[in-house]
Amino acid sequence: MNSNFKLIADNLHFSEGPRWKDGKLWFSDFYHHAVMTADEMGNVEKIVDVPNQPSGLGWLPNGDLIIVSMLDRKLLKFKDGNLTEHADMSKLTPFRCNDMVVDKNGNAYVGNFGSIHHGKDIKPTVLIKVDSNGNSSIAASNLDFPNGTVITPDGKKLIIGETYAGRLTAFDLDTDGNLSNRRVWAVSYTH
C-alpha cells in the first residue's frame, strides 16, 4: 500500500472539533483562541478569535456558525463577522464545555470535561442540549467525559464517546431532539 501524506497546516497548538464544510476543514485551535479553516491546497485562514477557548463547531439550519466557548461555558454564534452569545450553559455545568454535534433542526449537543481538572475523583457529568433558539437543558446525565459525539446519517441516533468509561453510548433521537433508549453501543476497554 502506498500512502501519500501532505502537510496542509502547521504551527497549530491544539486543533479540536474538526468539521468539513464548503470544501474546507473547519477546526478550533483552542490554545490560539481561534476558529480556523484549511483547504486541500494548504491555505489556512483564521475565521474568528474566541477569547475563552473555542472547541466544538457546528451550523444552524440557516447557516450560522455556532462555537463552544470552553472556559465561560457559552455557545456563541458567528454571523456577518460578529460573535454573539447564543446560549449560556454555565448554570447546567461547572466544568469546561468542549465537543458538540448539531442535528438537522439546529439542536446542539454539548459535552464537558467533568471534574478532571479540579484535582478530585472523576465524577459523571451531563450532556447539554441547546435548541436553535438558544434554550439550553440537560439532554442526558451520568456520562464519563462526554466527547466525540456523532449523529447517524438517518438522524435517528446520537452516539457519544465516554472518554473515561472506555465506551460509546447510543441514544435514540426523536424529531424534537430528545434522547431516549440509552444503551452501550461499543466498549473499548474495561477498568
Residue ranges and their predicted role:
Residues T190-H191:
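Conserved small/polar residues in nucleotide/adenosyl-binding loops
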Residues N11, L25-Y31, L65-D72, A108-D121, ...:
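Conserved beta-strand positions in repeat-built beta-propeller and related beta-rich domains
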Residues F171-G177:
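Short loop/turn segments immediately following beta-strands, especially the blade-tip
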Residues W20-D22, L60-N62, V102-N105, P153-D154:
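Residue-level detector of Asp-centered blade-edge/turn motifs that repeat once per structural unit
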Residues N82-K104, F113-S115:
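Asp-box/WD-like beta-propeller blade repeats and closely related beta-sheet repeat scaffolds
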Residues F14, Q53, R96, K123, ...:
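Beta-rich catalytic cores
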Residues A34-M36, K74-L76, V126-I128, R167-T169:
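A short loop-to-beta-strand structural motif that recurs across blades of beta-propeller domains
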